[in-house]
């Protein structure tokens, strides 16, 4: 996926989870943060950030904050990007997929993707990962009851004879492995292990990231 007309800035502050104040060429500019997670380890005063012009007519903020430099490591923090890059990658991930259907209603939830195969359905829930420490990627960075619910829906899918995958898009390149963040949300880690034991495929992929683009690159080991 590609962004157009990306500009560079320096993060100053985050008044709330939706906006940030960024220095762009010496001018303080209020920007939209495309990630409502905490991101405390990323958005620190003085951090180098990248922004894409907003395209929605009538919006109040001229830019979306999409990427940040963390100690020399470029991290995409656009919460919409993981689904976009998986949509581009889906047929490489599952070569038997004949149709890629986003936002698929299943049970009491709307899962991110349904891949239609000759032998049935392959349901995929995508999660973006921006939390990293010492090369180890972790999810989530804040408690997510919605994420736990999605894992239970994937278990139900397997019980009904479907294929199911929890797909973690690590929004950076330089990571060695992925694991659930039990310190932040033990229930999510427990649900992920339960899903894996039930037959849900749990995978994580690192990405190639530049200020103006991101694409899925390679699988990384999942530690449960």
Regions found by a protein language model. Give the residues of each.
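Conserved catalytic cores of phosphodiester-cleaving nucleases, focusing on short active-site segments
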Residues: 9, 86, 111-141, 154
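Short aromatic-glycine-enriched beta-strand elements
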Residues: 16-21
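Beta-strand/loop nucleic-acid-binding surfaces
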Residues: 27-41
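Short nucleic-acid-contacting surface segments enriched for D/E, G, S/T with interspersed K/R
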Residues: 37-50, 155
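Acidic-basic catalytic patches of nuclease active cores, encompassing PD-(D/E)XK
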Residues: 40, 71-102
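Flexible glycine-rich surface loops and low-complexity tracts that mediate binding to linear polymers
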Residues: 44-56, 206-207
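Nucleic-acid nuclease catalytic cores
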Residues: 135-145, 152-184, 206
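Domain-level recognition of nuclease-like catalytic cores that cleave nucleotide substrates
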Residues: 171-224
């Amino acid at each position: 996926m590609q962004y157009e007309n990306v500009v560079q800035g320096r993060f100053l502050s985050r008044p709330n989870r939706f906006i940030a104040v960024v220095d762009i060429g010496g001018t303080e500019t209020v920007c939209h943060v495309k990630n409502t997670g905490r991101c405390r380890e990323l958005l620190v005063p003085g951090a180098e950030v990248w922004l894409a012009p907003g395209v929605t007519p009538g919006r109040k903020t001229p830019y979306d904050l999409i990427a940040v430099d963390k100690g020399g490591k470029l991290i995409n923090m656009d919460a919409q990007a993981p689904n976009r890059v998986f949509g581009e990658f889906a047929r490489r991930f599952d070569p038997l997929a004949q149709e890629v259907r986003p936002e698929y209603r299943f049970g009491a939830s709307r899962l991110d993707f349904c891949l239609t195969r000759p032998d049935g359905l392959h349901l995929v829930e995508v999660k973006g990962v921006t939390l990293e420490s010492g090369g180890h990627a972790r999810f989530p960075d804040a408690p997510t009851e919605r994420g736990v619910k999605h894992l239970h829906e994937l278990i139900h899918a397997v019980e009904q004879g479907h294929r199911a995958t929890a797909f973690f898009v690590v929004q950076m390149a330089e990571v060695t492995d992925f694991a659930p963040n039990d310190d932040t949300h033990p229930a999510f880690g427990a649900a992920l292990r339960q899903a894996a034991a039930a037959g849900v495929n749990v995978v994580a992929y690192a990405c190639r990231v530049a200020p103006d683009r991101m694409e899925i690159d390679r699988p990384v080991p999942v530690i449960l």
